[in-house]
Amino acid sequence: MQGFVKDFLKPNLVGIEQINATRAKVTLEPLERGFGHTLGNALRRILLSSMPGAAITEVEIDGVQNEYSIKEGVQEEILEILLNLKGLAVKLEGKNEVLVSLTKSGAGPVIAADITHDSDLEIVNPEHVICHLTGNTEISMRIKIELGRGYVPASSRIHSEEDKSANGRLFVDATFSPVERIAYSVESARVEQRTNLDKLVIDMETDGTLEPEEAIRQAAMILAGQLDEFVDERIISAPVEVEEKPEFDPILLRPVNDLELTVRSANCLKAESIYYIGDLVQRTEVELLKMPNLGRKSLTEIKDDLVSRGLYLGMRLENWPPASLIED
C-alpha cells in the first residue's frame, strides 16, 4: 500500500503570472486526475479565511466622541473616515500590535503616507486617501494596528463596561486576511505519455502585503498541519459519526423580516431586492450606505443584529442563492 501512495505525482509551482500590482495567477502541475479540484478548493478556502495579516482595530480622533460625531473642517463623515482607514494595506514585523499617529493641517487630502510610524510597520498603499480637509483645519488621530486572522467584528473586542463607555475610542471591524479575492481553474496537463493529468491555476488578488508564492506556501503549511495527525500510523481512534450539515446555515435562508429591524430599515432592504439574510450579509457597509433612505443609524442597527447571530457584512457565500430559494 505504501508503494502506491509514493507513486503519486508531486506538483511543482511552475509559473507566476503577475497581472498587476495586487493580482497574480499561480500555476501548479502536474497533479493526478481529480487532485486539481481537491487541492484547489482546500487552498482557496484557507487563503480566503485563514491567512494571518495586520489590520486597524481601534482609532481615536481629537474632538470626536463617537462614529456619529461631526468633525469641523473635514469633508467626510466620521463613519466614512473609518471605512477609508479599513482600506489601508499594512505589514507588521516583530510586534503583535503597534500604535501610530497622524496629524495633518491645511486644505487638501490626508493620505496614508501622512501616518507617523516606526520601521516595524510598512504601509503598502501610501497614496490611499483617508479624508479631505477644507480650509485651515487640523486633524489628529491615534491608530491601533494588530496582527490577527480572518474577520473580527468590533463588538467582539469590547470586553468590559469601561470599553463600552469609553468616549473617543472608535472600534473598527477588522479584516486581517491579505487575500481579497481568489478563484481557481483546473486544466489538462501531460507528463510524457500520461495525458489524463491536472494543472491547477489559482487566480489571486491581495491587498499587496503578501506575495502570491508566499501565500500559497503559507496556505499549504496550514493544510499540512491539519493533516499531520492523520499521517501518524500509531493513532487509532474510534470512528466518529459526523452529522451531515446543510449547504447553508439555516439563518441565512430566513427572510430579513426575521431580523429585529425597524420597518424603515426592512423596507429599504427589500427595495434593493434584499429579501433573505443571505442576500444581506454579502453586501458591504459602503453598498448599504449608498441605498436611498438608509442612514448610519439603520446601518448600525443592521450590523448589531447580524453580530448577535454570529454574522457580519461582506461575507462571501459560495453557490448563493441555493436552488430551494430559486425554486420558491
UniProtKB/Swiss-Prot annotation:
Ranges where the record places region Alpha N-terminal domain (alpha-NTD): 1-234
CDD domains the UniProt entry points to: RNAP_alpha_NTD
Residue intervals passing through the bilayer: none
Stretches for region Alpha C-terminal domain (alpha-CTD): 248-328
Keyword Transferase on entry: yes
GO biological process, one term: DNA-templated transcription
Keywords: DNA-directed RNA polymerase, Nucleotidyltransferase, Transcription, Transferase
Catalytic activity: RNA(n) + a ribonucleoside 5'-triphosphate = RNA(n+1) + diphosphate
GO cellular component: cytoplasm; DNA-directed RNA polymerase complex
GO MF annotation terms: DNA binding; DNA-directed RNA polymerase activity; protein dimerization activity
EC number(s) stated in the UniProt entry for this protein: 2.7.7.6
Enzyme type, top EC level: transferase
Description of its domains: The N-terminal domain is essential for RNAP assembly and basal transcription, whereas the C-terminal domain is involved in interaction with transcriptional regulators and with upstream promoter elements.
Function recorded in the entry: DNA-dependent RNA polymerase catalyzes the transcription of DNA into RNA using the four ribonucleoside triphosphates as substrates.
Family: Belongs to the RNA polymerase alpha chain family.
Oligomer status and interactors: Homodimer. The RNAP catalytic core consists of 2 alpha, 1 beta, 1 beta' and 1 omega subunit. When a sigma factor is associated with the core the holoenzyme is formed, which can initiate transcription.
Name this polypeptide is given: DNA-directed RNA polymerase subunit alpha 1
